[in-house]
Each structure stands twice: as structure tokens, then as C-alpha cells.
Amino acid sequence: MKTAFHPTDLAGIQVRPSRLWTQSLSWMLFIVGVILYAQLSIARHKENPEDRVVPSARQLMDGVKASVLEPAEEDDPLDPSASLSERIRHSMLWKDTVASARRFLIALALLVPAILLGLHIAVFPYFGAVFQRFVLFFDKIVALSLLPILFIAFGIDEWSKIMLMVIGVAPTLILDTCNIALAVPREQIVKAFTLKSTNFDVAYRVVLKQVLPQIINSVRLSLKPLALFLFAGEMIASTDGLAYRIAIMRRHMGMDIILPYLLWVALLLFLLDALLRFANRRLHPWYQPL
């Protein structure tokens, strides 16, 4: 005998929405956010047509146009006859994106040795004896408190910002990699040695191959902290970059520029996260992260 349907059944653990419902529901909160923003903007502009705190759609479009097609205030103006591609290449958004992306990718590349160190701490006992306690202690130091020291050591140029990002994320990534590698059953390592595997084979062909998808997932989760430290460095001492531009626009209440910049940063991080997720699924089809 069938029981009566109850709305709470939709939230059951074993109830799976169809593909159409999944796609529709996934966009619902975005649509709600846009509607709420539009209502708030309309209400504020009724009271003050020149309101800049919650810019209207037209103000946002003008801000996007100024960001994408016009150079920054500190740069020389473009020739009115310049082509569209030339305008984009010399635009404020392009200049800031290239500057921030360069710092971000260099810091991301410098995290590779941190991952390998975490692997070695877990696999090789002497590495663990030397580094584990120090990394545990260093991980508790607030990275932003080291910013004055970094400015003294590296100056206010690129490397102080890059090192802030690395120091802020690397210790946590080292410990995360170490914990993931320690979860590999000891029996597999013993069995590999009985098959005449070398230390290198065990570390990189047995342990690393198993934990690599989880490490990539940890890197994905570290993208936002990396961006946070990048923004902190650029807002304090920089002459270009996405965070630098947001800080400049904040002084002028330029929300028509700030909001598109925030959405652009979120989109870039989302695309990088999607790229890492795609690569992880292609390289390790048996691992299905969120």
C-alpha cells in the first residue's frame, strides 16, 4: 500500500532529482541573487538617481566598458583610431589581470616543492624527524604578520607578494599532503619492498600515485587562500593588479568597477578550479571529487 506523498520526501537521502531538475535548481540561487540585487538597486535609485553604492545595470555596463576598453588613469590615453584588440590589450582590466595572474601562477608553481616535502615527511622517517615539528609550528604563524618582514627582506616588488602567498599556503599544504600519504596502508609499502622496489619507487610510484588525486583536490581548495594573500599584498603595496584596482576604486566609491572586478576574479578562480577538476578526472577516473 502506497503512503501519501509529503513535501519533506523531496529532501530524502535516497531521492535523486532528474538531470533537468538538477540543472534548474543549481541556477536558482544565482537567479534569486540577481533579482534581490536588482530590487535593491531600483529602490536606492528611486531615492537617489546618482547612487553609486548599488549601481544600476546601465552603470555596471559603463563600468565594464571602461574596464575592458579604456586604459587605467595612470596610463597614457589610447589613440581614438585604435582597434578593438589593441584597446583590450591596453585596457585597465587586461593590465591588472596579467599582473595578478603572473604572481598567482608563480606562487602556485612554488607550491610543488611543498607537496614533495609533505610526501617525504610521510614516507621517509628522517625527513619527518627533521621537518615535521617545525612545519607544525610554522603553520600556526599568521602569514600576514610576516608581511613587514617580507617587505624588508624582498622589498615592495613582486617577490614580497609571491612569498606571502607561498608562506601562507605552503605549511598547510605540506601537512595535508603528509596526512594523505600517511593514510596509505603500510602493507602496500612492505609488499612493494618485497618485490625489490627501491625507495624512489615506493615514494613516487606507489604512494604518490595513490595520493595524487587527493593532493590535486587539496590544491583546488587552496586557490582561495592563495587569492586572499595575493589581494592582501596588492592592496598594501602595489602599482597594478586586480586587488590594487579594487582598493583604488574604493576610495572613489567606484562600485561600478569594483563589482565587475569581483565577479571577474571569481570567474577566473572558478575556471582554474574547473581545469584542475577536469585534469584530475582525466588522470584519475576512479576518483570523483566534488
Model region roles, listed by residue range:
Residues 18-46:
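N-terminal signal-anchor transmembrane alpha helix
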Residues 172, 176-218, 246:
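Short cytoplasmic-facing helical segments at TM-TM junctions of multi-pass membrane proteins
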Residues 163, 167, 200-233, 260, ...:
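Transmembrane alpha-helices
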Residues 131-170, 179-180:
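Generic hydrophobic transmembrane alpha-helix motif, especially the helices
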Residues 1-29, 276-290:
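Transmembrane alpha-helical segments of polytopic membrane transport and secretion proteins
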Residues 182, 260-290:
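C-terminal transmembrane helix and the adjacent membrane-cytosol boundary/short C-terminal tail
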Residues 80-120:
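Transmembrane alpha-helix signature in integral membrane proteins
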Residues 95, 99-103, 152-173, 213, ...:
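Loop-to-helix entry region at the N-terminal start of transmembrane alpha-helices
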